[in-house]
Amino acid sequence: MKKAIVFLANGFEEMEALGTVDILRRGGIEVTTVSITANPVVTGAHNVPVTADTTLEKVNLADADALVLPGGMPG
């Protein structure tokens, strides 16, 4: 099974990140959401808190076939 990592940073665009996660999972891709900080709870651009599957310090990037970087502010 193919694997993708979706990175989440505070201020991420919820629709870009979570819409992408949804579509990839529907397509049979194993998706892991990753907070770029030590805190797994990340707040999106519209103040929606999302709990990532894991954090950057715990993930092995070499396991992924694709890396997804959603947009957002502050950038």
Which residues fall in each region the model found?
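Extended, subdomain-level signal for the structured scaffold at the beginning of enzyme domains
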Residues: 1-75
